[in-house]
Amino acid sequence: MEELVGLREGSSGKPVTLQELWGPCPRIRRGIRGGLEWLKERLFRAREDWYFLVALGVLMALISYAMNFAIGRVVRAHKWLYREVGDGHLLRYLSWTVYPVALLSFSSGFSQSITPFSGGSGLPELKTMLSGVVLENYLDIKNFGAKVVGLSCTLATGSTIFLGKVGPFVHLSVMISAYLGRVRAKAVGDTESKAKEVEMLSAAAAVGVATVFAAPFSGVLFSIEVMSSHFSVWNYWRGFFAATCGAFMFRLLAVFNSEQETITSIYKTRFRVDVPFDLPEIFFFVALGFICGILSCVYLFCQRNFLRFIKTNRYTSKLLATSKPSYAALVALVLASVTYPPGVGRFMASRLSMAEHLHSLFDNNSWALMTRNASPPWPSEPDPQNLWFEWYHPRFTIFGTLAFFLIMKFWMLILATTIPMPAGYFMPIFIIGAAIGRLLGEALSVAFPEGIVAGGEVYPIMPGGYALAGAAAFSGAVTHTISTALLAFELTGQIVHALPVLMAVLAANVISQNLQPSFYDGTIMAKKLPYLPWIRGRQIGSYPVTVEHFMNSNLTTLAKDMPLEEVVKVVTSTDVSQYPLVETRESQTLVGIVERTHLVQALQTQPASWAPGQERFLQDILAGGCPTQPVTLQLSPETSLYQAHRLFELLTLQALFVTSRGRAVGSVSWVELKKAISTLINPPAPK
């Protein structure tokens, strides 16, 4: 039944519903409706993004803090259970191992049962998406719940499994950003452009890092280095604005919950400010960077090959295919047994949480000098004021526990990365790097117990400064980033070691970037995700190689003067998504692009006015309304491989046509470009 309308007395003549005419308080309701329409118009402007970025930052800060709060309660319950079971070794062992085994198996089973995209870090897939590849259903909101629950269970295992939350939280932030983008597009009644979506996803990646560490500057820079090969400076403010909102809200919640008196850094340090290091120590910081670079190459090589072994081994591949929770439980049992405190875990500070690991490693006092004439007892519980007691053993010494910690955590982390569950891998790498730096710093403090003498002044060595540099250098070398130096400063709240830390990070990257792909690039290769290899500079001869050497010359074109019978044969015999449109079959002059879906739809709905038996051509279909796209960008056969690679990366392209004097002569897609780069980097052996 149609709604009745009428005219209000004294109105301009615009009809309104009778319900509005006779309803209570019509003027107030009209005012409220007008205000809401004005608010909608203001909020959903095409170029207004501040409200979107604020909502994204605040939401991710709330989620991050809520997860930390819940995880902290679960970890505290685990410690209470381990403490209250008594002195029986069997009960203590079961209380220590069953907890992480149950949590990890549930994390793997729950997340994988909902969606397989919820496992792992998520950063390799996001990096692939931002390069232009479409991964279906990867940003669906249903993945969000699976990722949150699975990640919470993973982190609730504590330092036993030794995993973090950076990568999965970036994935969560990007999913929220994609969902908010769809909501905004629906409210406006328009579809969001691909470029706009990429801009918002880049800002969301920065928010994910910032709300984990409360570090907006390094969050933006780290997300740019990891996720993008090219970045628009115009989009800079989005990342910084959203990351600042998220980091501020994250630390503000800690103040509201009486965890902090004011907004401060997460891992506060007490490094000497007047003279934090002497000039000769620069050499040791650079040497530490080279050591971290070499060790990062060893780690990346072992991790990538072990992951390949797990996937190809007959037994492990079958277990992963049939019962992922069983594999997760088996690995968790191994890791928990190794870290059992009365056993081997006594020599690797296994009772400390990951945050306590960093707090203790950043201590500016020399443990080796403090234990030279004293032997502190091993407390029944970790002492918050003396966490370094957990690193000391009278027979093993500080150097033994640090070295043993590095050796054990090295292979344990590699094993943990094979578990199909939501988990981050940056924080464990950061802690391992801090242990490397701490070991070198303790060795230097013993070698120079009175400090380094230069010009008559004595400056004692602070091992905590080397731990800070090692954390930034090793994590930067593994991820191929420089922003980890800034992250170390934002985490500790001190910048007194800015120059030596940055030099260590650069030295580590010199080694790792020339010998191994980054952790995320290696994962992309292991998962066989579509990606373009990186051409490192111009010195490898990418300019002499031109497009005509690797383009696909078997190009199927559609000419305007082609009969419809031949068009149908071409469409049914090929499965390409788009066809190059040429002027005539003889000239082969490229004039546009026809999408396969539009062409099939036009062929199926031929006009009824066409006389039967009359020969029709493709131009008749085009004149009837079949849409075509202009060719805005094309390659020349003389275009170099380096230039083609830069175009594909910069514009996130999937394929381009090759023309010579206007004639369509071939095409280049990711497949041809990747094969050409791989052949250039690893040329085949001469026959």
Curated annotation (Swiss-Prot):
Gene inactivation effect: Mice are born at the expected Mendelian ratios. They develop nephrogenic diabetes insipidus associated with polyuria and water diuresis.
Chief location of this protein within or outside the cell: membrane
Topological domain spans for side Cytoplasmic: 507-687
Expressed in which tissues: Specifically expressed in the kidney, predominantly in the inner medulla. All nephron segments expressing BSND also express CLCNK proteins.
Catalyzed chemical reaction(s): chloride(in) = chloride(out); bromide(in) = bromide(out); nitrate(in) = nitrate(out); iodide(out) = iodide(in)
Domain CBS residues, every copy: 551-609, 626-687
Membrane-spanning segments: 52-72, 94-114, 161-181, 204-224, 236-256, 282-302, 325-345, 396-416, 417-437, 458-478, 486-506
Binding site for Ca(2+): 259, 261, 278, 281
Domain of life: Eukaryota
Cited function: Anion-selective channel permeable to small monovalent anions with ion selectivity for chloride > bromide > nitrate > iodide. Forms a homodimeric channel where each subunit has its own ion conduction pathway. May conduct double-barreled currents controlled by two types of gates, two fast gates that control each subunit independently and a slow common gate that opens and shuts off both subunits simultaneously. Assembles with the regulatory subunit BSND/Barttin for sorting at the basolateral plasma membrane domain and functional switch to the ion conducting state.
Complex and partners: Homodimer. Interacts with BSND.
Protein name: Chloride channel protein ClC-Ka
Species of the source: Mus musculus (Mouse)
